[in-house]
């Protein structure tokens, strides 16, 4: 089961809501996955989904809250996945006109009915109704990627005006949803992991939220370990390269003028580095008598490298 299906399965069990919340929720579902059909003077409305839990919820809300006994149909998809497609249909005899009016989908102006692509503010004038609306939008047209791979949550809509309204509604909760066009659709999306967690909390997907949080924590721990390993590897590589360079410089001095020509403090460090090419500066310093700190050893080795460079260029 995909992570999207898990989220939808969870929030579709969220049915202990008021009639006002149910109205907000079914309005959002109808806006994002519904189509209006005309046959002569008759109209009908169809909601389409591949998720059986979503279809069941649509049917239940209409029956329990609005006394509408919708028609539930199932057919095979023509896509390669061969999933079932579930359709919840409300006809004129079932009271579709009244439903379209109270959900803010149809609006009558001067006796003429027209489609309203905006979100009716009366449907989302409380925080709970806003949450119910966003939950409905996810049930009807939302999806979330596998958090093991990437963080991405989106709502697919078919109107720019509606997508912008939905984005603004989501952002009233302090989120940063954005809108883009993808072919003939308008996508409201969130890509930041922490914000996706917040949105799951808003729509009531608490089990999915905890699963995502656990994945985020594990990914962060793995990333921290990888950064630490990479950092230590880089430091080790830097240390090894420095040691190799120091040994080469000391051997050059030994070959050209002999280590005996070096001052005692430099000669002692040079001899130790030749004998212990893999030891750290701190460990070399502890072998000296009296012991010398890491910075002191580093200073002496830099002087040795400078002498070697002068020998290479003939300036010694």
UniProtKB/Swiss-Prot annotation:
Organism's domain of life? Bacteria
Kindly indicate which segments of the sequence are annotated as binding DNA: 280-313
Q: Which UniProt keywords apply?
A: Cell cycle, Cell division, DNA-binding
Pfam families in alphabetical order: HTH_WhiA, LAGLIDADG_WhiA, WhiA_N
The UniProt GO MF terms for this protein read: DNA binding; endonuclease activity
Signal peptide segment: none
The GO annotation for biological process reads: cell division; regulation of sporulation
This chain's function reads: Involved in cell division and chromosome segregation.
Q: Which family does it belong to?
A: Belongs to the WhiA family.
Protein name, UniProt field: Probable cell division protein WhiA
Q: What is the lineage of its organism?
A: Bacteria, Bacillati, Bacillota, Clostridia, Eubacteriales
Name of the coding gene: whiA
């Amino acid at each position: 089961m995909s992570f999207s299906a898990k989220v939808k399965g969870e929030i579709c069990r969220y049915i202990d809501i008021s009639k006002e919340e149910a109205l907000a929720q079914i309005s959002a579902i109808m806006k994002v996955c519904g189509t209006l059909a005309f046959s002569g003077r008759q109209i009908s409305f169809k909601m389409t989904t591949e998720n059986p839990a979503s279809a069941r919820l649509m049917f239940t809300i209409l029956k329990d809250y609005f006394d509408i006994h919708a028609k539930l149909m199932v057919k095979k998809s023509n896509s390669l996945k061969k999933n079932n497609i579930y359709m919840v249909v409300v006809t004129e005899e079932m009271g579709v006109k009244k439903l379209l009016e109270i959900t803010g989908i149809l609006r009558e102006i001067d006796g003429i009915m027209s489609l309203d692509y905006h979100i009716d503010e009366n449907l989302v004038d409380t925080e709970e109704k806003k949450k119910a609306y966003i939950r409905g939008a996810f049930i009807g047209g939302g999806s979330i990627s596998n958090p093991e791979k990437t963080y991405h949550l989106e709502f697919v809509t078919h109107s720019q005006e509606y997508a912008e309204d939905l984005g603004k509604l989501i952002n009233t909760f302090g989120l940063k949803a954005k809108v883009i066009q993808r072919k003939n659709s308008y996508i409201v999306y969130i890509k930041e992991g922490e914000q996706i967690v917040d949105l799951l909390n808003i729509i009531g997907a608490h089990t999915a939220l905890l699963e995502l949080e656990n994945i985020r924590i594990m990914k962060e721990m793995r990333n921290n370990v990888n950064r630490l390993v990479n950092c230590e590897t880089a430091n080790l590589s830097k240390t090894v390269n420095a040691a190799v360079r120091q040994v080469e410089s000391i051997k050059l001095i030994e070959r050209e003028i002999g280590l005996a020509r070096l001052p005692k403090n430099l000669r002692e460090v040079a001899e130790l580095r030749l004998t212990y090419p893999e030891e750290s500066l701190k460990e070399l310093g502890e072998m000296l008598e009296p012991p010398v700190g890491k910075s002191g050893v580093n200073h002496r080795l830099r002087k040795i490298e400078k002498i070697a460079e002068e020998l290479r260029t003939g300036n010694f």
